[in-house]
Regions:
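Generic detector of intrinsically disordered, low-complexity, polar/charged segments
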Residues: 1-3, 37, 193
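Extracytoplasmic thiol/disulfide redox context detector
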Residues: 11-12, 24-102, 163-183, 211-216
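Amphipathic alpha-helical interaction segments
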Residues: 32-35, 132-135, 196
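Structural alpha/beta surface segment adjacent to cysteine/selenocysteine redox centers
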Residues: 67, 73-147
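C-terminal cap of thioredoxin/glutaredoxin-like
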Residues: 145-216
Length: 216
C-alpha cells in the first residue's frame, strides 16, 4: 500500500510473490470455512445484555471482529459510515479466531491503546485494517510502533507486563462465545424500541443501512 507521498511506509517489507499468494489462499480458505460455519449459527438471544444499546440510545451496532479477518477489513469502513450517518453507537468487540497467527496479539495491543484513550484504540484498529494485507507476525510490532509514533507515543517494549490487556481480550472472546459467535465479522443491529425487534444480525454488509432503517 502506497502512502500519499507515493512512498511505502517505513515498516513495509516486500514479500516474495509466493508468500503473498499463499497468504491470499489461506485467507480465502478461512472465509469459505467461516461462511459454512455461519450457515448453522444459532439465533442471538435478545435478552443478552451484550445485545442491547448503551444507556441513552435506542439503537446501536454491536460488532465482533478479528483484526486479521479480510471480511472484517472490508466491513469496517461501512460500519463506521453507518454509525456516523445514523448517529448511533458502534460497540466493537475483539474476537480473534484461532486460525489466525497475529490477530490475538494485535487485539492485545489494541487494548493497550484503548487504555490511553478509546478514540486511539478505534484509530489503531482502523489502521491495522488499512494495512492488514501487508502484516505478518514478524512486523506487527513495527506496524504498531509506526502508529504510536504517528500519534506522538512510544510503544512500550513489553505492552502487557501484567496480562491485563490479554485478560480483556479473553473476556471479549468469552462474551462472543456466550453470544454464539462462530464467524467474523458478526454484525448486529440492536434496539430497545418498545414493541420492536430487539436484535437483527446483518450477514451482508451491503444491507447494513437497510437493516438499520428496518429497526428504527
Amino acid at each position: 500500500m502506497e502512502s500519499e507521498s507515493g512512498k511505502s511506509p517505513n515498516f513495509r517489507i516486500k514479500l516474495p510473490m509466493v508468500r503473498k499468494l499463499s497468504a491470499f489462499f489461506i485467507f480465502l480458505l478461512c472465509d469459505l470455512l467461516l461462511l459454512s460455519l455461519s450457515a448453522g449459527a444459532a439465533e442471538p438471544n435478545p435478552n443478552d445484555p451484550a445485545l442491547r444499546p448503551p444507556k441513552g440510545s435506542q439503537l446501536a451496532l454491536v460488532v465482533f471482529e478479528d483484526l486479521q479477518c479480510p471480511q472484517c477489513r472490508l466491513s469496517a469502513p461501512v460500519i463506521k459510515q453507518a454509525g456516523q450517518t445514523y448517529k448511533i453507537p458502534v460497540i466493537r468487540h475483539d474476537f480473534p479466531l484461532p486460525m489466525h497467527n497475529w490477530s490475538y496479539q494485535a487485539a492485545v495491543i489494541a487494548h493497550y491503546f484503548d487504555a490511553q484513550s478509546k478514540q486511539l484504540g478505534i484509530e489503531y484498529r482502523d489502521y491495522i485494517f488499512e494495512h492488514q494485507p501487508e502484516i505478518y507476525p514478524a512486523i506487527l510490532r513495527s506496524v504498531s510502533e509506526k502508529f504510536a509514533s504517528d500519534h506522538k507515543l512510544a510503544l512500550p517494549f513489553v505492552v502487557d507486563p501484567q496480562g491485563k490487556f490479554a485478560a480483556e481480550v479473553n473476556a471479549e472472546r468469552d462474551l462472543g462465545n456466550r453470544v454464539g459467535i462462530n464467524h467474523t465479522p458478526t454484525i448486529y443491529v440492536v434496539s430497545s424500541k418498545p414493541g420492536g425487534k430487539p436484535v437483527l444480525e446483518v450477514s451482508d454488509k451491503t444491507q447494513l443501512f437497510q437493516s438499520i432503517d428496518a429497526m428504527k
